[in-house]
């Protein structure tokens, strides 16, 4: 009889909670309600109700079953318990948007079934961005744009209630096998911070070419926040995991190319002292705008102060080398590139730049050495940004040129074939193939 009464009260409690979902959400979604339930976790009834509340809040935060034809009426995170009987963590997606009507649906289609709530902060859209977001039951907030990406992102993060949060841009998308890879990571992040590959550009065949690794998923209780008005980032701390689920950046239209530089210049005029990362990215913006002489002292100050992250230090040496090369100072360019070895092993892109300088000077054996090294180091783990073609296609096609100039036609043809294996249907490879065929015919 006592057991029947207990079951009755369980059922009655559930019924009351279901009928008062708004109150439950408002109370228990807040910090006070959460810690109230946690404080009575050892009480079986309270613990049972807390577990049920998490399920209920999951439904309230992410009613996507009807929005985009979810086949199951039960959210994916609660289809089954994780190992040990504990439920999978709740995931909040945090985004900032402005006039992203054309791409937002594509992004959310690729990730909506992996998250439990969508936080969307709009910084001043004048198109139908909000209407698109509403189709996915996103929680939409307005945030006046103040030339500070971190401020907007941190506002979005502050609205999240999940155990973990992740960020995406509206023109990002989770494609192909990466969707399932991300699902597995989100089911059990097993770290405070998870880094994921970021595919920033692609060749004609769709192969990623510009790649970086970005901090992407965070344990909310750690209080992580972005820093930097432009090229914002979260400083790594706590336990870190490196996942293999890549995020693809598929921009449809180029944005304002001067926006970031203008923000940096505005900050300088206000008297702001740049952090090391801001120094580095300010120099990058100057380089992108062809202001090579202006970029060089910024890069030198960044390296001299010695407070930058290792990938940024290597990147600064690469940028300085390119600036000197554009200014027709090859010796200074070479010194800057060799300086990068103070911060780590030779990177493929650095090796290709050095090889290119030797090739311009018609020092073919030296150039070939560095292109060989680019291929050999291309299989090493990379940090920061890297160009995939510098690991395979570019050094191979340049080795073809080097060996041809040195008179080793068979080796040159072999490296041309290797380049073709990395980039199918490449025009340069086809031209070289015809060139070697004609050369062989003349020898006969």
Ranges and model annotations:
Residues 165:
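Short aromatic/hydrophobic "clamp" motif used to bind/position activated sugar donors
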Residues 95-114:
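Short, well-formed alpha-helical segments that are part of the catalytic scaffolds
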Residues 110, 122-131, 145, 169:
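A conserved acidic beta->alpha catalytic loop
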Residues 116-124, 141:
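Short beta-strand/loop segment that forms part of the nucleotide-sugar
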Residues 131-155, 159:
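Conserved donor nucleotide-binding strand/loop of the catalytic core
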Residues 90-92:
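Cell-envelope/extracellular polymer assembly enzymes that use nucleotide-activated donors
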Residues 151-157, 174-301:
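Catalytic-site signature of metal-activated, phosphate-bearing donor transferases
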Residues 105, 127-136, 177:
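Acidic helix N-cap motif at the loop->helix transition within catalytic regions
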């Amino acid at each position: 009889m006592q057991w029947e009464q207990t079951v009755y009260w369980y059922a009655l409690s559930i019924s009351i909670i279901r009928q008062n979902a708004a109150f439950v959400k408002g109370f228990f979604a807040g910090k006070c309600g959460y810690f109230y339930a946690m404080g009575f976790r050892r009480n079986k009834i309270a613990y049972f109700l807390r577990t049920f509340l998490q399920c209920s809040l999951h439904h309230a935060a992410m009613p996507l079953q009807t929005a985009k034809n979810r086949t199951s009426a039960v959210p994916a995170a609660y289809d089954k318990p994780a190992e040990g009987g504990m439920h999978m963590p709740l995931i909040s997606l945090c985004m900032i948007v402005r006039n992203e009507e054309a791409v937002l649906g594509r992004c959310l289609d690729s990730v909506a079934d992996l998250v439990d709530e969508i936080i969307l902060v709009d910084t001043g859209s004048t198109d139908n961005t909000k209407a698109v977001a509403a189709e996915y039951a996103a929680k939409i907030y307005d945030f006046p744009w103040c030339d500070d990406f971190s401020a907007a992102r941190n506002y979005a993060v502050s609205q999240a209630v999940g155990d973990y949060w992740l960020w995406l841009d509206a023109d990002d998308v989770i494609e192909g096998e990466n969707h399932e890879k991300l699902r597995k990571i989100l089911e059990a992040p097993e770290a405070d911070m998870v880094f994921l590959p970021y595919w920033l550009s692609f060749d004609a065949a769709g192969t990623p070419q510009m790649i970086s690794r970005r901090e992407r998923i965070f344990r909310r209780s750690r209080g992580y926040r972005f820093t930097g008005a432009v090229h914002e980032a979260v400083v790594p701390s706590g336990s870190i995991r490196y996942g293999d689920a890549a995020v693809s950046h598929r921009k449809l239209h180029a944005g304002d190319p001067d926006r970031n530089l203008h923000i940096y210049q505005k900050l300088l005029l206000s008297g702001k002292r740049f952090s090391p990362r801001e120094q580095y990215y300010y120099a990058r913006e100057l380089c992108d705008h062809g202001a090579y002489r202006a970029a060089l002292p910024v890069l030198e100050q960044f390296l001299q102060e010695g407070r930058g992250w290792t990938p940024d230090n290597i990147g600064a040496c690469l940028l300085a080398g390119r600036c000197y090369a554009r200014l027709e100072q090859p010796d200074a360019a070479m010194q800057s590139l060799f300086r990068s070895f103070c911060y780590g092993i030779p990177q493929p892109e650095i090796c290709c730049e050095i090889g290119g300088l030797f090739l311009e000077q018609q020092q073919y054996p030296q150039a070939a050495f560095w292109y060989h090294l680019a291929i050999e180091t291309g299989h090493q783990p990379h940090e920061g940004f890297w160009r995939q073609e510098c690991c395979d296609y570019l050094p191979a096609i340049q080795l073809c040129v080097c060996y041809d100039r040195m008179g080793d036609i068979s080796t040159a043809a072999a490296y041309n074939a290797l380049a073709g294996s990395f980039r199918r249907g490449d025009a340069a490879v086809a031209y070289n193939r015809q060139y070697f065929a004609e050369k062989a015919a003349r020898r006969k």
